[in-house]
């Protein structure tokens, strides 16, 4: 108990993040099953659109702030960054502990916000005037805002910690251009967090004072403008989606490189520049979420072009992964299956993103299920596939145990079918004009919604199967004697699992 509560050890804190993320992931998945159950058939199942939108909002917040970010940045980041840098721990170990312990209260506040009054049925964007005092009276939205504040503080502290660690604690010989790609992905992610989260904090604080202290930042009656909120929110919100995927890029680079039996990823310097370019461009495209609010045609033209340019560094990454795989004799291990699934399905999600980047097309597709399909392809089949690949790949290092490979392959096939069956039909629904954030729909949309709901049930079985596989591994205790991998990066030189204090003597990278 004391060891976990007051931990200053990056491995223990990383493990806490994994457990927290897995728990939040189960809550978020349960909410998504409620959504698909409601939409599995025309007519009402759970209730009215308010409760439906409370579920949708909580699903988004939990999956983003309490599942993907804690697992990718808190779990994999904490575990792997010090090991890959040859550093004994993070730069600020106690702040690291605080970053974690801010999250359970944040999640609690979010869950409480759903339980008081009518809940926050605003969508994760929390746009006023729907989120303002009149349309959403009561404490729900205020509690959700405080939840976001805590999660944001946690992420900012974590970001400062990672940036400082990478600048100051690289081992001798690990220059920036020789630093592993996963470490690069985490430090770029940290920079994005550091620059974008304060803007979100400002926006939701202004919303808080509009609701409670009679200001009118977003109220036209007092000279405010609700569009200002949208600009502030999306200036955070767009970098945020790259924050969610960049650590995944880093993990996929390591996994593909290692499973290909190559010594390094193809074009690793180009991969670094591509991630930097994605991070920079991510800050200057935010208004592509706002093509329907009545911006000037020249503004729309700029945001269309800038958004499409992001496809270039992303394409560099995709083709470099393919080049890394080129000419290899692949053994289809579970980790490489997830990585290959990532590359393929992330590309599909990226292509629908390029479609939506066209402002004139987006005016038709905005707020339809086409957008839902797009971002779930890059999240549910990008971020989640990367998490699955990374977890399976580094599980023997983290625990010193092995998973059942045959079951993992079956589980991959189950999940692959499930997520595609869930989200591919949503492209058709969107093109046919089915709008987002409604609990009911005209009969014409029934067929594809039934298919989608069946897919979500298959995905749920896949998730449960995965938890069973982990349980089986933990109770069977099949110890790893030595890693079967070539040491493609230095974390594999550790024991399995690593000693509590690794690198008590610092390593040296020679030429």
Swiss-Prot record:
Keyword Transport: yes
Binding of O2, residues: 242
Compartments it resides in: Mitochondrion inner membrane
EC number, UniProt record: 7.1.1.9
TM region positions: 15-35, 54-74, 100-120, 143-163, 181-201, 232-252, 266-286, 303-323, 336-356, 378-398, 412-432, 450-470
Cross-link 1'-histidyl-3'-tyrosine (His-Tyr): residue positions: 238-242
UniProt key word Ubl conjugation: no
Keywords: Calcium, Copper, Electron transport, Heme, Iron, Magnesium, Membrane, Metal-binding, Mitochondrion, Mitochondrion inner membrane, Respiratory chain, Translocase, Transmembrane, Transmembrane helix, Transport
Binding site for Fe(II)-heme a: 59, 376
Residues noted as binding Ca(2+) in the record, renumbered to the chain: 38, 43
Role description: Component of the cytochrome c oxidase, the last enzyme in the mitochondrial electron transport chain which drives oxidative phosphorylation. The respiratory chain contains 3 multisubunit complexes succinate dehydrogenase (complex II, CII), ubiquinol-cytochrome c oxidoreductase (cytochrome b-c1 complex, complex III, CIII) and cytochrome c oxidase (complex IV, CIV), that cooperate to transfer electrons derived from NADH and succinate to molecular oxygen, creating an electrochemical gradient over the inner membrane that drives transmembrane transport and the ATP synthase.
Name of this protein: Cytochrome c oxidase subunit 1
Species of provenance: Drosophila sechellia
